[in-house]
Amino acid sequence: MELYLDTANVAEVERLARIFPIAGVTTNPSIIAASKESIWEVLPRLQKAIGDEGILFAQTMSRDAQGMVEEAKRLRDAIPGIVVKIPVTSEGLAAIKILKKEGITTLGTAVYSAAQGLLAALAGAKYVAPYVNRVDAQGGDGIRTVQELQTLLEMHAPESMVLAASFKTPRQALDCLLAGCESITLPLDVAQQMLNTPAVESAIEKFEHDWNAAFGTTHL
């Protein structure tokens, strides 16, 4: 199982990388734009924050296959080992096929159906990212989409893996993992929600109170 943070906030990546067993960081054009930093400046900083073994993802902006391929090569040249995110459109599928032959690892993104995700995997994408909450918002079932896609990949494209995205709650993320999803990427607020459990703090305070009452200290 691989856990990623979905952000371009370098300071938060540095903070949470010390706590979470993260495999890397995912970004998209909206996330990069929100950072107000040039992609060519923020990507190296993110890579440094996650270390050489961390996996970094960045997305192309072009709408045609050739443009996607050219941008993917620029990203690869800037950050060796980067995974390039390609929207799963007709042109995106063509680009994924070309990039597979070029040896550039891709993730098929903006996936709203299991069929769409399977096509990305068959085209050569190593990762496929279904948008869980966005599927729900359109009246679909995001978790079921993940389940169906996971089953399809196991049967027909075992070299590819689901990297589920678009979460609003920790429950959605856990349900994805229970559905057999192999990797997820969490926005900062959802990652933080996993840590912020009031009952835990209350339990710790009770331990400290009892220990201090007995021994006059809160240390061993």
UniProtKB/Swiss-Prot annotation:
Entry keyword set: Carbohydrate metabolism, Cytoplasm, Lyase, Schiff base
Subunit: Homodecamer.
Family: Belongs to the transaldolase family. Type 3A subfamily.
Species, as recorded: Escherichia coli (strain K12)
Temperature dependence: Is not thermally stable at temperatures higher than 60 degrees Celsius. Is less thermostable than the isozyme FsaA.
SUPFAM superfamilies with a match to the protein in the record: Aldolase (SSF51569)
The protein's enzyme class: lyase
Record CDD domains: Transaldolase_FSA
PROSITE patterns found in the cross-reference section: TRANSALDOLASE_1, TRANSALDOLASE_2
Protein's name in the database: Fructose-6-phosphate aldolase 2
HAMAP family: F6P_aldolase
Active-site residues, as the UniProt record annotates them: 85 (schiff-base intermediate with substrate)
InterPro entries: Aldolase_TIM, F6P_aldolase, TAL/FSA, Transaldolase_3B/F6P_aldolase, Transaldolase_AS, TSA/FSA_arc/bac
UniProt catalytic activity: beta-D-fructose 6-phosphate = dihydroxyacetone + D-glyceraldehyde 3-phosphate
Its job: Catalyzes the reversible formation of fructose 6-phosphate from dihydroxyacetone and D-glyceraldehyde 3-phosphate via an aldolization reaction. Can utilize hydroxyacetone as an alternative donor substrate. Is also able to catalyze the direct self-aldol addition of glycolaldehyde. Is less catalytically efficient than the isozyme FsaA. Does not display transaldolase activity.
Biological processes annotated in GO: fructose metabolic process; ketone catabolic process
Cellular localization per UniProt: Cytoplasm
EC number: 4.1.2.-
pH effects: Optimum pH is 8.5 for the retroaldol activity on F6P.
Entry keyword annotation includes Cytoplasm: yes
An example molecular function term from Gene Ontology annotations: fructose 6-phosphate aldolase activity
GO cellular component, one term: cytoplasm
Family annotation (Pfam families): TAL_FSA
Lyase among keywords: yes
